[in-house]
């Protein structure tokens, strides 16, 4: 999972100064930071707050999901995408993974007081069970782009579009049938654990290059 922390600026809460953690580039990784990461991965979960990235908090257990072939936590997903958007200065709204997963699962009760974002594009990391998929909403074009790292978009497409239309109706939007869902060509996940990492790279590629074939 080293790729996840590339250019990911973590802000430690304890005695450590702010630093850019670039684990994918080992020559640039200082020995001090290397020891810090290794010590964190070996330790037991304590619930300690380790880093703050924008509005997102990363705990020791969050960063431990970066180790080996573990599934990425929602805090890591949200924090990384926040940095991607912030770094590129795209006019994009990040719908945090908890809210996005509730919305596209049709669980609207917790969304009644949600403030409708002003940005035209929404980046939505969605977790169904133990699998991450990426939904990108284009408000003005009335289009949804669905990317499943496994390449099984057909499993989710009707559910995603149906729940999005229902969400809009709940918010008072009447002309929801104009909305369409699209997919795009991309390479597929080859294992059982890298869906979160691929979601992050797909999102980063899309923001950089638009609707071209996504490859990793």
What annotation goes with each model-predicted range?
Residues 1-133, 137-144, 149, 153:
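Cysteine protease catalytic domains with a Cys-His-Asp triad
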Residues 97-216:
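Cysteine protease-like catalytic core of ubiquitin/ubiquitin-like
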């Amino acid at each position: 999972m080293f790729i996840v922390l590339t250019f990911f600026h973590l802000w430690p809460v304890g005695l450590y100064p702010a630093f850019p953690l670039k684990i994918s580039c080992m020559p640039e990784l200082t020995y001090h930071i290397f020891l810090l990461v290794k010590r964190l991965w070996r330790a037991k979960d304590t619930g300690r707050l380790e880093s703050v990235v924008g509005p997102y908090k990363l705990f020791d257990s969050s960063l431990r999901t970066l180790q080996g072939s573990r599934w990425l936590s929602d805090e890591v997903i949200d924090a990384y995408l926040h940095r991607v958007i912030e770094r590129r200065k795209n006019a994009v709204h990040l719908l945090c993974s908890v809210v996005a997963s509730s919305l596209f699962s049709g669980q609207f009760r917790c969304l009644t007081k949600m403030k409708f974002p002003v940005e035209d594009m929404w980046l939505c990391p969605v977790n169904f069970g133990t699998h991450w998929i990426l939904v990108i909403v284009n408000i003005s074009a009335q289009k949804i782009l669905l990317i499943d790292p496994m390449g099984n978009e057909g499993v989710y497409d009707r559910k995603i579009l149906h729940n999005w239309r229902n969400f809009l109706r709940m918010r008072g939007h009447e002309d929801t049938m104009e909305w369409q869902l699209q997919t795009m060509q991309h390479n597929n996940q080859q294992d059982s654990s890298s869906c979160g990492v691929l979601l992050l790279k797909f999102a980063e590629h899309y923001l950089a290059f638009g609707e071209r074939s996504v490859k990793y």
